[in-house]
Regions:
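Short, well-ordered coil/turn segments that N-cap beta-strands
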Residues: 15-19, 41-45, 80-84, 105-106, ...
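Active-site-adjacent beta->alpha loops and helix N-cap segments on the catalytic face
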Residues: 3, 66-67, 90-97, 113-139
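Active-site beta-loop-alpha junctions enriched in small/polar residues
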Residues: 26-28, 50-54, 89-93, 113-115, ...
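Active-site mouth loops of central-metabolism enzymes
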Residues: 17-28, 58-59, 81-92, 149-153
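Hydrophobic faces of well-ordered beta-strands that scaffold small-molecule active sites
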Residues: 20-24, 45-49, 84-89, 108-110, ...
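N-terminal amphipathic alpha-helix/helix-capping segment at the start of soluble metabolic enzymes
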Residues: 1-21, 74
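Glycine-rich tight-turn/loop motif centered on a GG-T
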Residues: 18, 53-64, 106-123, 150-153
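Active-site cofactor/substrate anionic-group-binding motifs, chiefly glycine-
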Residues: 40-100
Length: 153
């Protein structure tokens, strides 16, 4: 298989009634474990990173960190028999989301839920426009589940 758009993985899963884990990595050990599990199960894999992971991997430079993860995931995916995608999880900063898109992420999430709904929609629409122009999928957090997220520790 190869490095694919996250939407492709999710559409196939929906059509065939199965779930796909999207797992955050913070180090190479997590990455290797997730890839090995995917290989063993012959299942697609969605690798996720946070804004903090980009900063860490890039030694303070989030674009360099995003490029590092794209290069890592793509180099592995080329030799695998399973589809693999790379997703930015809960991107809260517009500029960081754009860096992930430019670096070559399969998909990004914009989490502008801290803003009023109209501003959230405005920022989300801008990210969708940028991402879709280069074939990147977008997940958006347009609100929150009141009561459920309040006391999660």
């Amino acid at each position: 298989m190869s490095y694919v758009n996250t939407k492709e993985i999710l559409e196939k899963a929906s059509k065939n009634y199965y779930g796909v884990p999207a797992l955050n990595i913070n180090n190479l050990e997590f990455f290797h474990a997730i890839i090995e599990a995917g290989i063993e199960e012959k299942a697609p894999v969605i690798i996720e990173t946070s804004e903090g992971a980009l900063k860490y991997a890039g030694n303070g430079d989030q674009y360099r960190g995003a490029k590092f993860f794209v290069d890592l995931v793509k180099s592995y995916a080329e030799s695998l028999d399973i589809p693999v995608s790379l997703h930015l999880d809960h991107g809260k900063h517009f500029d960081v989301i754009v860096k992930a898109i430019k670096a070559g992420y399969s998909s990004v999430m914009i989490d502008a839920s801290e803003y009023p709904f109209e501003e959230n929609l405005k920022q989300t629409a801008k990210i969708v426009e940028i991402a879709h122009s280069v074939g990147v999928s977008v997940e958006a957090e347009l609100g929150r589940l009141v009561g459920i997220e309040d006391n999660v520790e």
